[in-house]
Structure formats: structure tokens, C-alpha cells
């Protein structure tokens, strides 16, 4: 609870006053703190992580966002409905989330221009091209339009494979947030 409150205060009071570089460091530090509190350890190979990459990841859980931000702070593309979620929508809107109205090609073009602009400025942008969460054991069809901004900006696409593992080396499905699993159930399972 204290960590969530600190995230709200950070977003409300401190981030608006910071330089872009400081904002990204704070986002990363807060994500690391959250993952530490949840007992999540991140392993990442950043050998191909150039400035301004489009991170293309599978989507298992709500914590995927913090896993990515802990390693490579990024702007995210999310479905427009997220903006209307209590507290979380407000946080997302103030933490570099670009909201996409699904099913609107016109809006997709606008979002793609915004993403290409960020990539052109050297910012990382993350997308979950499956458009939903899964248990992480397989991939769904990718919505290819989400890859267009990297092509438009001449920036690389960095594939990100997110999976969760127990300390004993067994794959963990605890973080999954798919099907009939509620946010509360997912959080308790982690």
C-alpha cells in the first residue's frame, strides 16, 4: 500500500518537474521497487537494446509493464478503455501511455504517428501486439499495424519474450491475468 501511494505521489508531484532523463530513471527505480516488493526478479539480455526501439512483447500480466520499465523505461500503447479505469487509468495517462481506440483505422494512424515521433526522439515504446493477455505458453496473432511506427521511423523492433519462473526452475502461471482471473486473484497469486 505504501509503495502504491508513493507511486501516486511520484506521478502527481515529482514527475512533472523532472527532466525527461530523470523521469525515465524514476520510472525505472519505482518499477524495480514494486517488483522487489512482489518478489519478482528480472533477467534481461539488452545486447540489442538501441535508443528508440519498438519493444514488441507478449502480454501475460499487469506486471509486464513494470518488468519492461525496470529494464528499459518505455512509453506504452494501451487500449483506450484503460484510460477510464479508476486510479490505474490516471496513472497510465500520466506515465507516457498512448491510448488506442480499437477498431478505428483513423485513430490507429494517429497513434502510429505519435509512436514514430517518440521513436524518432530516441524513446523506447512498448506494444503488446497480441492485443490481450495470455498465460504465456503460446503466442496469439499479432496486430501488425502496431509494428508500422518502427518502419516509419526507421527504428529497430526489439522482440521481448516475457515468462515467469519459480525459484526451482518450473514455469509459473501465477502472474497470468487472463481468462476469468481477476486483478485481485492475480495479485494474490504473485
Give the ranges of each region predicted by the language model.
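Soluble, non-transmembrane catalytic domains of enzymes that act on hydrophobic metabolites at membranes
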Residues: 37-45, 65, 77, 83, ...
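Membrane-embedded segments
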Residues: 62-123, 137
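Conserved H-X4-D acyltransferase segment
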Residues: 27-80, 92, 135
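Soluble extracytoplasmic domains of inner/organellar membrane proteins
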Residues: 108, 115-116, 123-147, 151
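Residue-level preference for the first positions of well-ordered beta-strands
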Residues: 52-54, 97, 124-128, 156
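A transmembrane-helix-recognition feature enriched in membrane-embedded lipid enzymes
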Residues: 1-43, 90-95
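Generic beta-sheet signal
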Residues: 79, 100, 128, 160-163
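A cross-family acyltransferase "interaction/gating" segment
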Residues: 87-89, 137-190
Amino acid at each position: 500500500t505504501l509503495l502504491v501511494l508513493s507511486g501516486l505521489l511520484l506521478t502527481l508531484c515529482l514527475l512533472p518537474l523532472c527532466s525527461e532523463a530523470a523521469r525515465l530513471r524514476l520510472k525505472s527505480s519505482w518499477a524495480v521497487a514494486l517488483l522487489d516488493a512482489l518478489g519478482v526478479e528480472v533477467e534481461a539480455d539488452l545486447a540489442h537494446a538501441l535508443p528508440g526501439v519498438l519493444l514488441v512483447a507478449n502480454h501475460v500480466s499487469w506486471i509486464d509493464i513494470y518488468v519492461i520499465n525496470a529494464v528499459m523505461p518505455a512509453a506504452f500503447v494501451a487500449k483506450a478503455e484503460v484510460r477510464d479505469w479508476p486510479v490505474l487509468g490516471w496513472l497510465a495517462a500520466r506515465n507516457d501511455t498512448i491510448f488506442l481506440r480499437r477498431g478505428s483505422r483513423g485513430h490507429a494512424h494517429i497513434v502510429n504517428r505519435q509512436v514514430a515521433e517518440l521513436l524518432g526522439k530516441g524513446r523506447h515504446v512498448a506494444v503488446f501486439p497480441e492485443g490481450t493477455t495470455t498465460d504465456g505458453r503460446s503466442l496469439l496473432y499479432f496486430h501488425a499495424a502496431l509494428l508500422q511506427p518502427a518502419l516509419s521511423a526507421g527504428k529497430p523492433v526489439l522482440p521481448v519474450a516475457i515468462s515467469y519462473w519459480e525459484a526451482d526452475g518450473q514455469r509459473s502461471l501465477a502472474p497470468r491475468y487472463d481468462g476469468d482471473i481477476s486483478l485481485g486473484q492475480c495479485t494474490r497469486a504473485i
